[in-house]
Curated annotation (Swiss-Prot):
<dbReference type="GO" id="GO:0005829">
    <property type="term" value="C:cytosol"/>
</dbReference>
<dbReference type="InterPro" id="IPR011611">
    <property type="entry name" value="PfkB_dom"/>
</dbReference>
<comment type="similarity">
    <text>In the C-terminal section; belongs to the cytidylyltransferase family.</text>
</comment>
<keyword id="KW-0511">Multifunctional enzyme</keyword>
<dbReference type="Pfam" id="PF00294">
    <property type="entry name" value="PfkB"/>
</dbReference>
<keyword id="KW-0067">ATP-binding</keyword>
<feature type="region of interest" description="Ribokinase">
    <location>
        <begin position="1"/>
        <end position="318"/>
    </location>
</feature>
<keyword id="KW-0808">Transferase</keyword>
<protein>
    <recommendedName>
        <fullName>Bifunctional protein HldE</fullName>
        <ecNumber>2.7.1.167</ecNumber>
        <ecNumber>2.7.7.70</ecNumber>
    </recommendedName>
</protein>
<comment type="pathway">
    <text>Nucleotide-sugar biosynthesis; ADP-L-glycero-beta-D-manno-heptose biosynthesis; ADP-L-glycero-beta-D-manno-heptose from D-glycero-beta-D-manno-heptose 7-phosphate: step 3/4.</text>
</comment>
<keyword id="KW-0418">Kinase</keyword>
<keyword id="KW-0548">Nucleotidyltransferase</keyword>
<comment type="pathway">
    <text>Nucleotide-sugar biosynthesis; ADP-L-glycero-beta-D-manno-heptose biosynthesis; ADP-L-glycero-beta-D-manno-heptose from D-glycero-beta-D-manno-heptose 7-phosphate: step 1/4.</text>
</comment>
<feature type="active site">
    <location>
        <position position="264"/>
    </location>
</feature>
<dbReference type="InterPro" id="IPR011914">
    <property type="entry name" value="RfaE_dom_II"/>
</dbReference>
<keyword id="KW-0119">Carbohydrate metabolism</keyword>
<dbReference type="InterPro" id="IPR029056">
    <property type="entry name" value="Ribokinase-like"/>
</dbReference>
Length: 474
């Protein structure tokens, strides 16, 4: 299956469900309390993240799509914190505020990467009138490409069947992340996304893939669903439809640090891809790839278009790391969040040879990621003469990107990459040859930002000019 990213900017997705605030208190612990046999945590870091349906909405916004969120909150500090955090990532919040209930909040205390305790602040909203939510759904649906109902059994979806009918009447696909063993309440939905445990609570234990397909397909028919997407942890996902062959997607996770919120990412990416015009099978492929990315992060997390692009194509087929400048800056920002050191070099690289390969490998060893900035065809011609380049820019970038040492390749139009380097500000700027560091384009900007500038040797006797001259003699 050839899969490409859709234009997420054109997608409009409405999320309705149980919103909550995830709070994390971090700190060291070095002693036991004299008051009780419990560790004393000296809190030095506090984080607040949207959880539940709010995390789904944030996942949608992180793709660049238009995300609107409807849910129930209290009138309290937690509701303000949740709204502020979501507005900063371009989620449009349309909350129903209930004075008699607190905003659902989950507080986790952690030390040395170990969760010591979780405190839940909630009363549930099952006794709250659904009419204000109905009104918000009806008002939003005409402009939406998909509706997500995110059920955490906290009360926002107590009347879920009426919400499904509103979406069907408007012709909007409705995707549901279910909760509990009563799937009958989701009858008529477009698609459900249970995990394996939730699925087996409803249909019984499945000992084989064939049994899973048989029971899942029957469930699709019994509940008048269009499809069922079962998330199966390390075994990936299975898409089941009444009159289609099953689609099994293997997991794409390389390392698993935390599965918190992975289901939110799956349904968020799935619905957004559908709203952007992707067919169901491709949308599931994208959701599976996104899940593989997000479980490699700690806590509830999101996935960016760049991360998703790299995930669906893999290191060997992702355009070989070829990026526009704006994409590169986003990728560098993400790498820095992971604590990675960025190395950058530049050149024409007209005919890639052993000297280039050795030089780039040595440059890569200086840090964690290597950017290669490449002169455009016009820039190369001005620098090298009318007969150059021998290979056009696209081919030069493709060959460079195929090297294991190279993470990202970007083009520049100017005679030097000074402006580009000043924009990216690598941790280490590298140039090959006999340059003085102060003469290297971009060195002043890198030094001013606290970075390093290094000069590496090229291998003697190997150059593009020598190769061209040797070819001409033959």
């Amino acid at each position: 299956m050839k899969v490409t990213l859709p234009d997420f900017n054109k997608a409009n997705v409405l999320v309705v469900g149980d919103v909550m605030l995830d709070r994390y208190w971090y700190g060291p612990t070095s002693r036991i309390s004299p008051e009780a046999p419990v560790p004393v945590v000296k809190v030095d870091t506090i984080e607040e993240r949207p959880g539940g349906a709010a995390n789904v909405a944030m996942n949608i916004a992180s793709l660049g799509a238009n995300s609107r969120l409807v849910g129930l909150t209290g009138i309290d500090e937690a509701a303000k914190a949740l709204s502020n955090t979501l507005s900063q990532v371009n989620v449009r919040c349309d909350f129903v505020s209930i004075a008699t209930h607190p905003t659902i909040t989950k507080l986790r205390v952690l030390s040395r990467n170990q969760q010591l305790i979780r405190l839940d602040f909630e009363e549930g909203f099952s006794n709250v009138s659904p009419e204000p939510i109905y009104e918000r759904i009806q008002q939003a649906l005409p402009s939406m490409g998909a509706l997500i109902l995110s059920d955490y059994a906290k009360g926002a979806l107590s009347h879920v069947q009426q919400m499904i009918q509103l979406a069907k009447k408007a012709g909007v696909p409705v995707l549901i992340d279910p909760k509990g063993s009563d799937f009958e309440r989701y009858r008529g939905a477009t698609l459900l996304t249970p995990n394996m445990s939730e699925f087996e609570q409803v249909v019984g234990v499945c000992h084989t893939d064939d049994e899973l397909v048989e029971k899942g397909t029957q469930l699709v028919k019994d509940l008048a669903l269009d499809a069922l997407l079962i998330t199966r942890s390390e075994r990936g996902m299975s898409l089941l439809q009444a009159n289609e062959a099953p689609l099994h997607l293997p997991t794409q996770a390389q390392e698993v640090y935390d599965v918190t919120g992975a289901g939110d990412t799956v349904i968020g990416v799935l619905a957004t891809a559908l709203a952007a015009g992707k067919p169901l099978a491709e949308a599931c492929f994208l959701a599976n790839a996104a899940a593989g990315v997000v479980v490699g992060k700690l806590g509830t997390s999101t996935v960016s278009p760049i991360e998703l692009e790299n995930a669906i194509r893999g290191r060997a087929d992702n355009g070989f790391g070829i990026m526009e400048e704006s994409q590169l800056k986003q990728a560098v920002a993400l790498a820095r969040q992971r604590g990675e050191r960025i190395v950058m070099t530049n050149g024409c690289f007209d005919i890639l040879h052993a000297g280039h390969v050795s030089y780039l490998a040595n440059a890569r060893k200086l840090g964690d990621r290597l950017i290669v900035a490449v002169n455009s065809d016009a820039s190369t011609k001005r620098l090298k003469g009318e007969s150059r380049p021998v290979n056009p820019l696209e081919q030069r970038m493709t060959v460079l990107g195929a090297l294991g040492a190279v993470d990202w390749v970007v083009a520049f139009e100017e005679d030097t990459p000074q402006r580009l380097i000043a924009s990216v500000l690598p941790d280490i700027l590298v140039k090959g040859g006999d340059y003085k560091p102060e003469d290297i384009a971009g060195s002043k900007e890198v030094w001013a930002a606290g970075g390093e500038v290094k000069v590496l040797n090229f291998e003697d006797g190997i150059s593009t000019t020598n190769i061209i001259n040797a070819i001409k003699k033959k």
